[in-house]
């Protein structure tokens, strides 16, 4: 049996008071930030490319705190002691999003920011159905915990393995249904990613939201999730949602609509995210200048080969 620290945390944390778990997460921030390492340096570089400015030491520590808080909240969501997490959520633009889903699916592009599971739980608690995709992680028992957590909150989950496409399954699952389809899409370096302007640099993001909205001929919204009213024992969640996102009116004939729609939602997301960059949990390479060009070229060639 493979030991997973995260699996152990999932088993232990819900037995503890919410305030104890959140305070423990808060206390750990200083240690993690001081230790540094590649993920912290990548976080720093990504924040700089998003905003055009090097983050201060305090801002970087705040980013580490936000990242750890998100994990701590995920451990507690769905448990009786984590029930207060469903409160303290404000959702700007929810009425328009919900109205757009009345006559069919609406796609919602998200980034890895704030607490997306907490925001999703709030949406489900307010009477809307969510269908989304979750990447399969190891060990399988950990992925099963994540799925059980989200399904317990009212979401429908389609698991996807690395390198696998579930686009067709997702289309069939949501077609004709009054559902919201949130998709984390601010990174895709697999070869199928679309190159866009993200903040102050070029980045690779997922085609999924724009491709799904185009395939279904349904609206595409975009949201940025951040924290506010932060204390050592927790924080509120703020969701800013705008849409429907549309392609430029002067889009050239023959231009790729999915690419144009992707740039449109990314521009909206980046503008909102730049207001609170410490809540963007991007500790991986996403900007083109940070990628190995030869590896990226091979990935793109392989993607093209598979899709001939």
For the regions a language model picked out, list residue spans one by one.
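A conditional alpha-helix N-cap/helix-loop micro-motif detector
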Residues: 87-91, 112-113, 139, 160-164, ...
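Conserved beta-strand termini and adjacent loop/short-helix elements that scaffold enzyme active sites
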Residues: 94, 133-135, 160, 242-244, ...
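Non-catalytic C-terminal accessory region of glycerolipid acyltransferases
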Residues: 32, 50-53, 57, 61, ...
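Catalytic core of membrane glycerolipid acyltransferases/transacylases, capturing the structured
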Residues: 104-162, 191-194
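Short amphipathic alpha-helical segments and helix-helix/interface helices
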Residues: 94-98, 120-124, 143-147, 170-171, ...
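Active-site metal-coordination segments of metallo-dependent hydrolases
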Residues: 40-42, 136-140, 202-206
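Soluble or luminal CAZymes and related metallo-dependent hydrolases
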Residues: 4, 39, 89, 162, ...
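Membrane-anchoring hydrophobic helices of lipid-metabolizing enzymes
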Residues: 1-110, 143-148, 154, 308
């Amino acid at each position: 049996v493979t030991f997973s620290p995260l699996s152990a945390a999932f088993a232990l944390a819900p037995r503890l008071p919410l305030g104890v778990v959140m305070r423990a997460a808060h206390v750990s921030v200083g240690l993690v930030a001081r230790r540094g390492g590649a993920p912290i340096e990548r976080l720093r570089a990504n924040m700089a490319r998003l905003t055009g400015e090097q983050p201060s030491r305090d801002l970087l520590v705040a980013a580490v705190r936000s990242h750890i808080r998100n994990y701590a909240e995920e451990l507690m969501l769905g448990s009786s002691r984590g029930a207060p997490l469903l409160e303290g959520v404000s959702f700007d633009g929810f009425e328009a999003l919900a109205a757009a889903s009345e006559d069919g699916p609406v796609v919602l592009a998200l980034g890895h920011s704030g607490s997306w599971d907490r925001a999703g739980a709030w949406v489900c608690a307010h009477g809307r159905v969510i269908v989304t995709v979750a990447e399969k992680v190891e060990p399988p028992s950990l992925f099963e915990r994540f799925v059980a957590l989200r399904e317990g909150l009212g979401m429908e989950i389609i698991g996807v393995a690395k390198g696998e496409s579930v686009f067709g399954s997702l289309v069939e699952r949501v077609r004709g249904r009054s559902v919201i389809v949130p998709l984390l899409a601010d990174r895709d370096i697999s070869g199928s990613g679309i190159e866009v302007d993200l903040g102050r640099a070029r980045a690779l993001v997922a085609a999924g939201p724009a491709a799904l909205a185009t395939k279904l001929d349904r609206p595409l919204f975009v949201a940025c999730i951040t924290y506010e009213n932060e204390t050592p024992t927790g924080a509120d969640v703020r969701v800013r949602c705008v849409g429907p996102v549309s392609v430029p009116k002067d889009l050239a004939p023959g231009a790729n609509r999915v690419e144009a729609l992707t740039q449109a939602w990314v521009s909206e997301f980046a503008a909102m995210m730049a207001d609170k960059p410490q809540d963007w949990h991007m500790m991986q390479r996403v900007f083109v200048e940070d990628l190995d060009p030869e590896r990226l070229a091979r990935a793109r060639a392989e993607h093209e080969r598979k899709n001939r």
